[in-house]
């Protein structure tokens, strides 16, 4: 049981015993040390509802609150807050066995779920660009955390590998192959796509050929499918190069693109019709939803099949949900997709429920996110206004980090410099994004993200190496030594370390990775205060052993937490 859950359950029992069973404890960490360690704010609302004096009700709750061996002080503050100060011995006991556990005391969930996180999901017609960064790293972090908590994780890369543009690309592939330039052209997907588009726009004969390839592709023509597969293979190889550099856990096995649902789309439309959910509007097949209204107050329509018989993204997404329920038996699906797609997902989820493609027990969640902006406050672009390739951004991150490392440590071996530059550069880009509330837009700033001060990856990586350096200076470390929490800085660090499990559970529940970055930054800053206030190397005996143990738990927490963000730590920098 997590620390917060333990206190919550104790408070809930006390509220029941005090005659207010429907009241919520509303427990949260105290905002300042003078308010204790935790604060319960639920009494005031319960008192107001019953027209009682909130301080009197708070006292009744405290009289029933059993925190023996847990709290050293419980007091009423202000109009009826209950402030709880934890006993140092209690914290010591909770942390004492953490080093014996590779999971740092984080328990697996009692009822594991089958969870899919759908993320990254680029269109395979082009190379990945900076617009793919947020989905890729937010999704990867959520997948890592949810899996770490003991759930069965299914990663989903719903790539765009189908549609009319593939007729154009296949036609151009045939043309370049005949000219002996296919391999050269395919090595640069952006140029390949651009050249194909020019041919399509300027040459009517080529455009007709491309449309014919679409028909043949959708009809399952073996020769065209073979060409399409080659194109998909090359495109995925580009994606995998980005994933490797980013340290993202997606593999070829996680790819199930739009093409996988192609044969299901007519069935989806038939099943919607059988449920009397379809209407026809100017030849198109539409689902009208009373839950969504336009400006005139009329139900909004969602097209699932166009007048020409073609299907839309919504139809494919419906097929994917149906498959994920029937074949994968998922309990929860998390879609990490740009916030601008919010209405699409809410409408698609509503249709799924009405059609029975997903039962109510199957959680469907859209985890949206804002836009990465340039210094001008507009979406991040090249100086000339073009799209920034993601691989080029990551290369620049490494080069900038390499320059910093070379400046600070010019005598390091070249291989060591490159290793540090990779960890720091890639970590900086990822952390700068993950540390922001995902709902917000943010401004991309090289100087801020690569700084060794403040809430950045380099600061946390440096904090880890600083702890690691302590252990290179001691002759012996006894992990079984008892924790002795006597100084305020020791207690504050121990209190922070004891909340790791709470934070991970909250990240998994809310899908906000910045809660983890926030926590790790607090751990690092609290350790620095502890390091200044409580000498480790100059202390002796049981005191030194205890402080070393706190330092080791700190290092392991930083390493595990950063690992869940997909960020490397270094033993030295």
Swiss-Prot record:
Top-level taxon: Bacteria
Main location: cytoplasm
Spans traversing the lipid bilayer: none
Keywords on record: Aminoacyl-tRNA synthetase, ATP-binding, Cytoplasm, Ligase, Nucleotide-binding, Protein biosynthesis
Motif ('HIGH' region) on chain: 122-132
Aminoacyl-tRNA synthetase recorded as keyword: yes
UniProt entry tagged with the keyword Methyltransferase: no
Compartments where located: Cytoplasm
Entry's Gene Ontology cellular component terms: cytoplasm
A biological-process GO annotation: arginyl-tRNA aminoacylation
Reaction(s) the record says it catalyses: tRNA(Arg) + L-arginine + ATP = L-arginyl-tRNA(Arg) + AMP + diphosphate
GO molecular function, one term: ATP binding
Enzyme Commission designation: 6.1.1.19
Record InterPro entries: aa-tRNA-synth_I_CS, Arg-tRNA-ligase, Arg-tRNA-synth_N, Arg-tRNA-synth_N_sf, ArgRS_core, DALR_anticod-bd, Rossmann-like_a/b/a_fold, tRNAsynth_Ia_anticodon-bd
Coiled coil: none
NCBIfam families xref list: argS
Subunit structure: Monomer.
Family listed: Belongs to the class-I aminoacyl-tRNA synthetase family.
Name of protein: Arginine--tRNA ligase
Source species of the chain: Laribacter hongkongensis (strain HLHK9)
Gene for this chain: argS
């Amino acid at each position: 049981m997590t620390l917060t859950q333990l206190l919550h359950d104790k408070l809930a029992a006390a509220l029941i015993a005090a005659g207010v069973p429907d009241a919520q404890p509303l427990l949260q960490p105290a905002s300042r040390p003078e308010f204790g360690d935790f604060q319960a704010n639920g009494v005031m609302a319960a008192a107001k509802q019953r027209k009682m004096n909130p301080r009197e009700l708070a006292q009744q709750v405290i009289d029933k609150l059993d925190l023996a061996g847990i709290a050293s002080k419980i007091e009423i503050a202000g109009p009826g807050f209950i402030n709880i100060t934890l006993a140092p011995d209690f914290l010591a006991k909770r942390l004492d066995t953490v080093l014996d556990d590779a999971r740092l005391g984080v328990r697996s969930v009692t009822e594991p779920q089958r969870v899919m996180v759908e993320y990254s999901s680029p269109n395979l017609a082009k190379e990945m660009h900076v617009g793919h960064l947020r989905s890729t790293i937010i999704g990867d972090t959520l997948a890592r955390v949810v899996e770490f908590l003991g759930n069965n994780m299914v990663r989903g890369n719903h790539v765009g590998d189908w549609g009319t543009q593939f007729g154009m690309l296949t036609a151009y592939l045939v043309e370049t192959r005949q000219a002996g330039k296919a391999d050269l052209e395919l090595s640069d997907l952006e140029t390949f796509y651009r050249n194909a588009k020019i041919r399509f726009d300027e040459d009517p004969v080529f455009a007709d050929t491309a449309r014919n390839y679409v028909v043949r592709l959708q009809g399952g023509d073996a020769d065209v499918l073979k060409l399409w597969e080659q194109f998909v293979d090359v495109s995925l190889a580009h994606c995998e190069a980005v994933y490797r550099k980013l340290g993202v856990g997606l593999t070829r096995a996680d790819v199930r693109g739009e093409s996988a649902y192609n044969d299901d789309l007519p069935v989806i439309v038939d099943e919607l019709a059988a449920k009397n959910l379809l209407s026809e509007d100017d030849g198109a097949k539409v689902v009208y939803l009373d839950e969504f209204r336009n400006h005139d107050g009329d139900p909004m329509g969602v097209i699932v099949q166009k007048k020409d018989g073609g299907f839309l993204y919504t139809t494919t997404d419906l097929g994917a949900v149906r498959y994920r329920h029937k074949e994968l038996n998922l309990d929860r699906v998390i879609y990490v997709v740009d916030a601008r797609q919010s209405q699409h997902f809410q409408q698609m989820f509503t249709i799924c429920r009405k059609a029975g493609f997903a039962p109510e027990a199957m959680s469907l969640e859209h985890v949206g996110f804002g836009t990465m902006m340039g210094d001008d406050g507009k979406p991040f672009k090249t100086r000339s206004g073009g799209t920034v390739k993601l691989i080029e951004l990551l290369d620049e991150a490494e080069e900038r980090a390499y320059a910093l490392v070379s400046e600070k440590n010019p005598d390091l071996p070249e291989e060591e410099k490159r290793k540090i530059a990779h960890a720091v550069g890639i970590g900086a880009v990822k952390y700068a994004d993950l540390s922001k509330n995902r709902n917000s837009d943010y401004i991309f700033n090289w100087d801020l993200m690569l700084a060794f001060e403040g809430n950045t990856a380099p600061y946390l990586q440096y904090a880890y190496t600083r702890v690691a350096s302590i252990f290179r200076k001691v002759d012996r470390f006894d992990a079984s030594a008892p924790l002795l929490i006597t100084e305020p800085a020791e207690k504050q660090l121990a209190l922070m370390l004891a909340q790791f499990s709470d934070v991970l559970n909250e990240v998994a529940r809310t899908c906000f990775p910045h809660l983890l970055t926030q926590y790790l930054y607090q751990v690092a800053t609290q350790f620095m205060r502890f390091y200044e206030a409580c000498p480790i190397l100059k202390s002796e005996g049981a005191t030194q052993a205890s402080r070393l143990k706190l330092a080791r738990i700190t290092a392991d927490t930083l390493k595990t937490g950063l690992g869940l963000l997909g960020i490397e730590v270094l033993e030295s920098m």
